[in-house]
Amino acid sequence: MQLRPYQQAAVDAVYNHLRDRDDNPCVVIPTAGGKTPCMATICKDAVTLWQGRVLVLAHVKELLQQTADKLTAVCPEVDFGIYSAGLKRRDTNNAVIIAGIQSIYKRACELDRFDLIIVDEAHLISFDGEGMYQQFLADAKKVNPHLRIIGFTATPFRL
């Protein structure tokens, strides 16, 4: 799958950010602008170029299935699994795992180390340090202190 120029620019900006800075980037692409192909490209590169392990977090099973379908289309050679009660799958040993936050948020220490976590709909991460995403990300950083996190959203600001 060929990314559109603005999608490729977003992916390139993520790589530059991860290389040049220690904090975690947030990618803002409008609704229906193609966030999922960008995420799939990053997953593919993380596994094939950097031998990393990736977790993609989403909050509803429809997004999990959409991401799994796109990942298969973009990079069928990547070993990926799904961890979601709603989809009745609990894959844990894959290079890329697509997971529902409700199914996984108390299990960071049970899973093997991740090098990269991608959060779809990142605007759902609480600012106050509480909530499922914050709990999971804090626990995942205990497992791998060098963990990098990339957020994706169409709506980075809350009213």
Ranges and model annotations:
Residues 1-28:
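Conserved pre-motif I regulatory segment
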Residues 20-22, 92-93, 106-116:
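Short basic/glycine-enriched coil/helix segment immediately N-terminal to the Walker B
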Residues 21-33, 37-67, 144:
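Conserved SF1/SF2 helicase motif Ia
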Residues 27, 56-57, 82, 149-151:
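Structural beta-sheet core signal
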Residues 61-86:
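Conserved helix-turn-beta segment of the N-terminal RecA-like "Helicase ATP-binding" lobe
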Residues 64-66, 91-92, 106-107, 126-127, ...:
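Switch/connector loops and helix/strand junctions flanking conserved nucleotide-binding motifs
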Residues 86-97:
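Conserved motor-coupling elements within RecA-like helicase/translocase cores
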Residues 101-102, 109-158:
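SF2 helicase catalytic motif II
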